[in-house]
Amino acid sequence: MALDIYSQWYPNRAPEPTDSPGEVASLPWTTAHSVALQLPSMCLLDFSRAAEGRPLLVCAPYALHRAQIADLAPGHSLMEALQKAGVARLYLTDWRSAAPEMRYFSIDTFLSDLNVAVDTIGPPVDLAGLCQGGWLSLLYAARFPGKVRRLVLAGSPVDVSVPSELSRMVASLPQQGFEVLVRQGDGIVSGKQMLKVWSIPFSLLDVEAALQRRLDRKSEDARALLDCFTHWDSDPLDLPGTYYLEVTDLIFRQNRIAAGHFVALGRKIDLAAVKLPVFLLAAENDIVVPPDQAFATMRLLGTRPAWLQRETEPCSHLGLFMGREALAGSWRRIARWLQSDLGETASERSRISA
């Protein structure tokens, strides 16, 4: 019965690709940058304004939407806000929409490319994971502890035993259904198909909540901003089937990261061994990753209490990354926290793990 219901969502035909292999996202970027590195799974974008300083790498989610979640529009760009807050060396992962040759890319593939990006920037880096970029960043910090100085987890699902809309949706669907979706796409999961299933259409009120501002349709600026959001929301990423099945099963169904059973690049990950400073940010009105789930990560870490920081922003899930007030408030405080002296010793900063 469950598979019959699932087949109504995914008709028996191969999905149309979201874009051609290698095609650059048509939505323009807001903040000036250069391409620092091109890897099989991503482009590493360099938003730096200086050659010196502590580097911050923002890890965008590789789930449904493109990396412009962190650079949507003027006044609604995390990258712009971090620059204004004094972060001089700044980078962003721009994950590629999956082409046929990427069908077997796994979580390990993305960790490997993230490691190359960090080595290119020069470790140790500060790492900020957005939504599902958070669990990837946490896995990376646990796998390569000496390469990450401080970690920011913003609206990030890790311990999915704490309920959320997203974890409930995954749990309600049989894993065979996800496998059918992958087979129908010849190993690629269509972003357009995912958009139909996972994303509820945004009302004007939803968009206003995400941007934390009123949008008067009579205003040309407001119409342009609404068009920008709509363009971003309707231009999803295709995902590698192997990666998609690992995420839905190992992370959201089996909860392996929180349980201590996840193996990353050949090594079992123990979150209690993560001892670096961590800042956790949650959205008060988040149904995707509610505060209880976002903050449940704290009890899994080995970080000393003085190095743990948590903050709740009165916004929706997307508001954490593009909301005008969140960017001017919580993210400015996060930038100050990254620049503050927490008393890490030189040995703790320089310890590199193979």
PLM features: what roles do these ranges have?
Residues 2-6, 122-123, 136-242:
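Alpha/beta-hydrolase-fold enzymes
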Residues 21-99:
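Short, surface-exposed "cap/lid" segments of acyl-processing enzymes
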Residues 102-120:
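Alpha/beta-hydrolase active-site loop
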Residues 128-137:
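Gly/Ala-rich beta-loop-alpha elbow adjacent to hydrolase catalytic centers
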Residues 287-293:
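Conserved alpha/beta-hydrolase "acid-adjacent" motif
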Residues 298-318:
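Catalytic histidine neighborhood in serine/cysteine hydrolases
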